[in-house]
Amino acid sequence: MESFDKTPYISTIDKKYYESEIGKKVLEFINYHKPDFYTELHCYNLKNYVKLTSMERYKKTGIPPLIKLGNHVLVSSVSPLIRMTYFSTETVCKTLEFPCFEKLNPQIIDEYGFNKDLAIETYEELLNLILSSSSRKHFENEMLKKYKSQVYTAMEYAQKVFGKDFPPY
């Protein structure tokens, strides 16, 4: 994982993140705007792909693995540290993870079969879906059409972390 700015990296699943300057700004933004849709854009080091998508992550941290959307784009809900506290169950909360370009090298690209253009296309497709969705219902219907297996995985993870009746995003 990386920070888009040049501050030291702190994971959003670490309480220290929300005590940092940027974390406090994020919480202020959420409290002020009370969004219906909230999306965090992250990048990750492709060499951590398996670690981020493995159930070992859940066993070690209690946080479900990120879900493979396709073309090395990963998706999940937002940190459980803020999901239940700062948002209603009706808020659509997503974290989108994209490989950090500056961490890519020919060896990593070959090892993981990474295609930058396909990854960008997948990322843009989901961002456009989020931007064009006027309601949770519309978003859910479109996600089921395009990413059915990922939605079922998200539902399973939401139940593990938030309980049986909690939505998958």
Could you tell me what each predicted segment is?
Residues T7-S11, N48-V50, N105:
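Extracytoplasmic/secreted cell-surface and envelope-processing proteins
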Residues M1, Y9, Y38-E40, C93-T95:
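Conserved beta-strand scaffold positions in the cores of enzyme catalytic domains, especially
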Residues M1-Y17:
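Active-site rim/loop-helix segments in enzyme catalytic domains that contact anionic ligands
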Residues Y18, G23-F37, L52-Y169:
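C-terminal accessory segments enriched in acidic
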Residues H42-N45, P99-F101:
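Catalytic metal-binding/acid-base residues of hydrolase active sites
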